[in-house]
Regions:
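Bacterial N-terminal signal peptides that target proteins for export
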Residues: 1-8
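Bacterial signal peptide processing site
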Residues: 22-24
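Acidic/histidine-rich, surface-exposed loop or edge segments in extracytoplasmic proteins
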Residues: 35-44, 112-114
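Post-signal-peptide N-terminal segment of Sec-exported extracytoplasmic proteins
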Residues: 39-74
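Short, structured surface segments that line ligand/substrate-binding pockets
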Residues: 68-108
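C-terminal partner/receptor-binding element of secreted or periplasmic proteins
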Residues: 114-140
Length: 140
């Protein structure tokens, strides 16, 4: 009987420890800090997207997108770039820089994540991501 009681206490302690440590950093609220290209390699703070649903929507689009692992050379600096930041200043994480180029027809966007992940987005995903990040609309 004593062994059974001790095993129940041990299991209860393990469950408390596991649930206490399961606050994954990915569940923390984040915001998107956007900068716009204004001059040769110079960017200016443009927008801060703080709505958690919009941030999650952008993260979902990026996570569902298949990036190519290749180094690309663009003919001009990115039109915009953005990073995800935690709203809680005590959380430190390495930020990935996402750079956005708008196509000449303004119907698709090209994104480079970090140094070597490239994708071209068009259609609904491009329009949604661009609208949330910049507050502007792509031509549909």
């Amino acid at each position: 009987m004593k062994i059974r009681n001790w095993s129940l206490v041990f299991i209860a302690i393990c469950i408390l420890i596991i649930t206490g440590c399961s606050n994954i950093v990915g569940n923390e609220d984040q915001r998107i800090q956007v900068q716009k290209h204004i001059d040769d390699n110079e960017y200016k703070d443009f927008k801060m997207a703080t709505d958690n649903n919009e941030v999650l929507q952008v993260k979902k689009i990026l996570n569902d997108t298949t990036f190519e692992n290749k180094k690309v050379e663009m003919s001009r600096p990115a039109d915009y770039h953005f990073i995800f930041q935690f709203k809680n200043p005590k959380i430190e994480a390495k930020a990935v820089l996402y750079q956005i180029w708008i196509s000449p027809n303004k119907d698709k966007i090209e994104i480079i994540a970090g140094d070597s992940r490239y994708v071209q987005l068009e259609g609904k995903h491009a329009a949604t991501l661009f609208q949330i990040v910049t507050g502007e609309k792509l031509v549909e």
